[in-house]
Every structure is written in C-alpha cells, then in structure tokens.
C-alpha cells in the first residue's frame, strides 16, 4: 500500500479542512494510506498584528515552513487555505488541485442585539485581524471602533464571549468547516464586503516532478472553482499585492460568463476603489489581469503601498 503524507498547520481549522481533504482523497484512492503531519509556521508563532506584518511585506507567512517540508520530501501534499498562498509558488512546487469552494463570504457574529453589520450602534467594538476587513469597516462604518483580534477560531469566539468585543468578523468557511455554522449571525453580502481573493477555497500543493502525487491530488479538483480562483488571484498578482493587502475580489460564473469584482481600500477608510470586469469564463486569467490594470490606473498601487509604510 502506498503512503501519502499530507502536511498542514496544526490549528483546529487547518486540521478540520485537511481531514476533509483526506476523506475525499480516500474515496478516490481507497488503496492509499494517507497520513497527516502538522507543521508549525511563522504565522502560528508570531504575535504581531497583521497590520504590522503587512508593513514588513512578509509573504508566505502561513505557508513557508510547510512548503520547505514539501521541497525536502518530508511530506507529499500540502493543504493550504488558498487565500494564504502567495500568487507565485516556489520553484519546484505547484498547485495541483483546488477542491470545490465552500462559502467564500465573511461572517459576522455578535452579542445580543448586535447581529447585523448595518445595524450595529455607533461606537460598537468590532474585532478582526484582517487588514482588508479593517480598511472596509473604516470606510463603510467609520462610527465603529475597529479592534485587532488574532488567534484561532475558538480564541476569537471566546474573546467575543468575554465582552471585549460587541461583534467579530471571520471567514464563513472557517466556521462551516469546524461545524460552527450555527454561530453565524450574518453572512455579509459581497455587494457590501468583498472577500479576500481565494477565500473559502483550499489548495493542494505538490512537487512539480511528482506525477503520481499530482494525479492523486487532482482527483478532487473542481474546474469551476479553479476558474473563479484564477481570476481572483490574477487580479491580486496584477496589483502586486499579497494576502495581507487591503484587497478584495469575488468572481461569479453564470451562463458561461465570469464576472469579477475587485476592491482596494485605504487602511484608514478614507479612500476606496471598486470596479468590475466580465468576459468568457475561458478568459478568466485575462479578466483578472485587466481588472488589476484598470484599478492601477485609478490609484490602487498607492493605497496598497501605503499599508507597507
């Protein structure tokens, strides 16, 4: 029996989504023994805020050590939250499979009487770690107090329960994958808050020359998700931005057409650029690149660069 070692971070969410991946792979490859190996990353150990890390321009914050293990052949497949992956893979590695995306939206969880983002009272304390969400909240609701909130899902929920925050915003996918969908009070519509590029999707990364493992991983690949993700990540790459930039993107496919909406905001909420591009789904990469070029002409680079200063 062949053994395939699957590497992941050790958080509750990372393990939940990796176990989901392994269960799907076992359905396709019942004669293969899949083993999970947890790996600590810089993101797990560093206590700085994501704003501080964005200023440093850190890339691969959540994935570098896992990719190093993959290159060293200590693991065969790496499972990542796709939104955490830089838009370029290290030499010798590739994204070989993107399973079907779950809900890509952001989710709000609030205390009693704090269940809708638009209805939060003036001065309400809202917690998030994301630079993108902070920029959005300061633009959309400048009357709110935006507070930093880091830690795993359980830590963030506990912080809400302690009374330190009136509401928090998390990725809906994380709550769904950890079987806590019932905690969500509001799925924030992308028309209001665009998710991070790739949010809600997973990536299976392998060594480029490992054809056997690539075949194993590709068995759970979802083409529609791949098309949407390609547009979103080409948009991010075209902006020269990374996963900690104040950038949102959301692609939708309908009747063979892919519509991509992009958003870039100033961290202090004083300026927002939002635009849409559409085309045949086969041109998904070009759609993302064209939208990035359009937004660069409108000053997006200055907003992204300001976060690093």
Curated annotation (Swiss-Prot):
Note: The porphobilinogen subunits are added to the dipyrromethane group.
UniProt xrefs under InterPro entries: HemC, Porphobilin_deaminase_cofac_BS, Porphobilin_deaminase_N, Porphobilinogen_deaminase_C, Porphobilinogen_deaminase_C_sf
Domain of life, source organism: Bacteria
Family classification: Belongs to the HMBS family.
Annotated HAMAP family: Porphobil_deam (MF_00260)
Keywords carried by this UniProt record: Porphyrin biosynthesis, Transferase
Keyword Transferase: yes
Entry function: Tetrapolymerization of the monopyrrole PBG into the hydroxymethylbilane pre-uroporphyrinogen in several discrete steps.
Protein name: Porphobilinogen deaminase
Cofactor binding description: Binds 1 dipyrromethane group covalently.
GO terms, biological process: heme biosynthetic process; protoporphyrinogen IX biosynthetic process
Entry GO CC: cytoplasm
């Amino acid at each position: 029996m062949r053994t395939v070692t699957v590497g992941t971070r050790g958080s509750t969410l990372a393990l939940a989504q990796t176990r989901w991946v392994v269960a799907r792979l076992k359905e396709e490859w019942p004669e293969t023994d899949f083993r999970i190996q947890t790996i600590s990353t810089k993101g797990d150990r560093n206590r700085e805020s994501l704003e501080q890390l964005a200023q440093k321009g850190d890339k691969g914050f959540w994935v570098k050590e896992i990719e190093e293990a993959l290159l060293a052949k200590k693991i065969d497949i790496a499972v990542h939250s796709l939104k955490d992956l830089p838009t370029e893979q290290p030499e010798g590695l590739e994204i070989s499979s993107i399973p079907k995306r779950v809900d890509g939206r952001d989710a709000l969880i609030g205390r009693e009487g704090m269940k809708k983002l638009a209805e939060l009272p003036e001065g309400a304390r809202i917690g998030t770690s994301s630079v993108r969400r902070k920029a959005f909240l300061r633009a959309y609701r400048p009357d709110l107090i935006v507070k930093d909130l880091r830690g795993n899902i359980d830590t963030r929920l506990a912080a809400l329960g302690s009374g330190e925050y009136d509401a928090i915003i998390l990725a809906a996918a994380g709550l769904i994958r950890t079987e806590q969908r019932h905690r969500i009070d509001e799925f924030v519509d992308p028309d209001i808050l665009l998710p991070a590029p790739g949010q809600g999707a997973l990536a299976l990364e392998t060594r480029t020359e490992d054809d056997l493992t690539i075949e194993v991983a590709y068995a759970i690949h979802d083409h529609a998700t791949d098309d949407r993700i390609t547009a979103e990540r080409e948009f991010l790459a075209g902006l020269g931005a990374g996963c900690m930039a104040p950038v949102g993107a959301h692609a939708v496919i309908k009747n063979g057409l892919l519509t991509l909406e992009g958003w870039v905001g100033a961290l202090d909420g004083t300026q927002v650029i939002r635009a849409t591009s559409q085309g045949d789904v086969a041109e998904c990469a070009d759609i993302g690149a064209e939208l990035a070029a359009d937004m660069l002409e409108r000053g997006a680079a200055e907003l992204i660069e300001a976060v690093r200063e």
